[in-house]
Amino acid sequence: MLHNNTAVPPLLEVSGISKQFSGVMVLKHIDFTLFPGQIQALLGGNGAGKSTLMKIIAGLEQPDKGTLKISGHHVSHLNPTKAHQFGIYLIPQEPLLFPNLSVQENILFRLPKHQVDKSKMKQLLALLGCQLDLHVSAGSLNVADQQLVEIMRGLMRNSKILILDEPTASLTPVETERLFAQLRELQQQGVGIIFISHKIPEIYQLADQVSVMRDGTIALSGKIRDYTTDDIIQAITPAAKDQPLNGTPKLGLDLSNNQHQTVPDRPILTVTKLSGEGFSNISFSVKPGEILGLAGVVGAGRTELAETLYGLRPAVSGEIKLKQHTVNGLKTAQRLAQGLVYLPEDRQSSGLFLDSSLGWNICSLTHNRNTFWIRPAYDTAVLERYCQILNIKFSHINQPIKTLSGGNQQKILIAKCLEAHPAVLIIDEPTRGVDVAARNDIYQLIRHIAQQQVAIIFISSDLDEVVRIADRVLVMHQGEINGELTKQQMDVDTIMHIAFGEHKPQQAASC
C-alpha cells in the first residue's frame, strides 16, 4: 500500500465540483481525494450525488464548476475515452458485458492493438487468484465472475483508478470475500479504488478511508477507523437508524379492496414437484399474509424458479396452483390478471421503462387491462398517491424514471406491482443498491403489504434481511430445496450452511 507515504501525490483530486440538473443542485462544491493503494468507501443516501460525482470522474458528465486533477495533471472536458487514457475505469452495478461473446473477447473488446497482450491477461488472472475459462460465453457466468471480467477490462487498459458501484449487491458472503481478496491484491499494486456501497459492515472489512455524501455535499470524510457505524449512519441521514418491524406502520396504503378474494388459512399458491431450467423437484406452499423467504447462493435457481412461477420460463414438469386452480398453461398476462405479480431483480432492464414518466411506469401493468387508451390524468393521480405513501422523491411528474436515484426507482417498481393488486407478490432482491433509509422504508412496506393478506415470496442474497423479514425460509442449493426453517429456527449461519449443502436439517412443518 502506497497511500501511507505522504510524499506520494494523489491519483485523483476533485476540487469545488458543482453540478445541477433542471435547476436542481445535485453537487455542491465537492472536494474529494484518492491516493495510490487506497480503498476509499463512498456512501450516501439515494439522491445524495454519488452517481453524478462518479460519472464526472469517469467522463460521463461534465461539471458546471470546479476542477479535476489526475496524477497531478489538470484535466478539462473529460470524456470516457480520455478517462480510460488517464487510467480511470468505472465498473457499474450491472456488468455491461456482451453475453454472446467469450470472456476473452469481452476483456479485449475495443482495446488498442498495441495493448492486446494475452499473456498479460493470463498473468493478471493469476495475480487475482482466479481460474476463469476465457473461452466460455460471458452470459454463462454468474454475477461475481462477470464483475471479475469488468475488473480485468479495466486492468488491461492499465487503469490506476477503479470505481466499483455496489459490487456486492448480488453476491453471497463467500463471493464477496473472494472479491475483497482480489481488491486487496490490487491495492498492494498501487491501484486506487473507490468502493460505493450501502452495506456499512463490509466497508469496515475492506476500506481504509470513508466519505459520506448527503444532499450533494461531503458530510463526513476521513480514516474509517476514526468513525463508528452510528457516525456513518448519522452522516448519511439523521433518521436512518434501523427501525423495528413491530406493529403496523401507518403508511396509508389500503389493499382491502383487492379484487382477489383469499382464505387466510388456505394456501393461495401451491407448487408441487416443479422442475425447470436451473431447478428441479420444487414443492412448497404459501398462505395469504405470509412472507416466505427464498435464500441460496448465486446460481442456486431462485430467480429461475420465480420466473417460471410468473410464466417467463416454461416448466418442464410439475404443477403450479394459484387459488386452487392450475396455471401452468397460462401466459404471464393471464397469471397477472389472476393476481400473481413479479418484481424482478434487475429493475433497469426488466422492471422499468427508463425513458418513460413515473406515472406511466406505475400504471404500465394495468394500462392494457383497464383500457386501450393511456390516461395521463389518471397516471398523475396514481403517482401522487404512491409518492405520498412511499416517500418517492422527484422533480416533476413527466421526469423520465432513469433520472431518479436507485432507491426511488425501486419504490416506483414496488408501486407498479401494488397497482396491479397482487394476491401473490414475488419480490426478487428488492433492496439491491438501496440505502439504509430506503431499505427501512421497503422493509416496513413489505410487512404492511403482508398484513393486508397478500402472500409474499421474498428472494434476497442479504441473509440478515431474510432473517429480519421472513416468517419462514426455503433454502436452495444447486436447484433444489435443501432445507426449510421456521422463524424460530432461522439465523444467518444456519442458512449459510444449508445454502452450501453442508447439511440438510429436519424439514419444518409445511404451511
From Swiss-Prot:
Binding site for ATP: G44, G45, N46, G47, A48, G49, K50, S51
Primary localisation category: membrane
One example GO MF annotation: ATP binding
Enzyme Commission number(s): 7.6.2.13
SMART domains, A to Z: AAA
A Pfam family per the record: ABC_tran
UniProt KW keywords: ATP-binding, Cell inner membrane, Cell membrane, Membrane, Nucleotide-binding, Repeat, Translocase, Transport
Self-association state and partner proteins as the record states: The complex is composed of two ATP-binding proteins (LsrA), two transmembrane proteins (LsrC and LsrD) and a solute-binding protein (LsrB).
Entry function: Part of the ABC transporter complex LsrABCD involved in autoinducer 2 (AI-2) import. Responsible for energy coupling to the transport system.
Protein name as catalogued: Autoinducer 2 import ATP-binding protein LsrA
Gene: lsrA
